[in-house]
Amino acid sequence: MNLEVEIAGIKLKNPVIAASGTFGFGREYSKLIDISEFGAICTKGITLKKRIGNPQPRLCEVYAGIINSVGLENPGVEAFINDELPFLKSFDTKIIANINGFSKEEFVELTKILTSLVDMIEVNLSCPNVKEGGMVFGKDPKKVYEITKSVKDVASCPIIVKLTPNVTDITQLAVAAENAGADAISLINTVSAMAIDIETRKPLIKMVTGGLSGPAIKPIAVRMVYECFKKVRIPIIGMGGIMNYKDAIEFFIAGATAIQIGTVNFINPKAVCEIKEGIEAYLERKGFKSIKELVGSINI
């Protein structure tokens, strides 16, 4: 069975991508699985300079999910190129660099630095954990257009724009990204959330609020992928609470060309293998010859 998919001319051997964040730069997981099993690996968020992230506690478990407010902890782009990228390139998989800027100029500079070194760049306009920048950019279609166009003007590799779900109409963001030249969009990022310790009456996250991921957000994500599929022609990478192959299949039917898995990696490092096997068995059982035949095939 052929599980190959194509995004902006880049062929992935299968549609399962490691989502930015929970997979880090793959080192920890490489001790548990062959990370070449992924069609692509999306790095944790990269900034121009090193960031120590938000104060602890910055992660808590809730019903059917996790709230995090890590705050883009990362070594900075120079250290990523020198220390992490050679390791990632030693595996048989595509590399997607997730970039985060606090101004249009920073997004452009990161793109210039990385565009010839990776297979694709994912522009994170939707991180809900950092007060200065990301959320403002991600919620405003005009800013989404402006930054996407600025990044595309200096990019030699395909550009994926990652969208926030914390808006009234995510399709406006999707259309803005497409009109600005985005090669693909990815959605959804985490949903703004909060949890409280009733004994101390204090938030469980030091920064008070964070981003909810995991099974709790899957129905929201599927709905938003479906809505965007009806509005744009560029590929959609779907994510949000995918725990097994059945979840992945829902995203394909709703309109996703590929999927990203994040929170499940914490629980089951071998999820990528199980999801791939499940997808293949489903396609065979239903008589599909490829993933492409399944994409957007919902019966209304």
Curated annotation (Swiss-Prot):
Its main location: cytoplasm. It is an enzyme of class 1 (oxidoreductase). FMN binds at S20, K44, G45, N98, N124, K162, I188, G214, G240, G241, G262, T263. The keyword Glycoprotein does not apply. It comes from the Bacteria. It catalyses: (S)-dihydroorotate + NAD(+) = orotate + NADH + H(+). CDD domains: DHOD_1B_like. Its cofactor is FMN. Its EC number is 1.3.1.14. Transmembrane segments: none annotated. InterPro entries: Aldolase_TIM, DHO_dehydrogenase, DHOD_1B, Dihydroorotate_DH_1, Dihydroorotate_DH_1_2, Dihydroorotate_DH_cat, Dihydroorotate_DH_CS, Dihydroorotate_DH_I. Binds 1 FMN per subunit. The keyword NAD applies. Pathway: Pyrimidine metabolism; UMP biosynthesis via de novo pathway; orotate from (S)-dihydroorotate (NAD(+) route): step 1/1. Pfam families: DHO_dh. It is found in: Cytoplasm. Belongs to the dihydroorotate dehydrogenase family. Type 1 subfamily. NCBIfam families: PRK07259.1, pyrD_sub1_fam. HAMAP family: DHO_dh_type1. Heterotetramer of 2 PyrK and 2 PyrD type B subunits. Catalyzes the conversion of dihydroorotate to orotate with NAD(+) as electron acceptor. This is Dihydroorotate dehydrogenase B (NAD(+)), catalytic subunit. It comes from Caldicellulosiruptor bescii (strain ATCC BAA-1888 / DSM 6725 / KCTC 15123 / Z-1320) (Anaerocellum thermophilum).
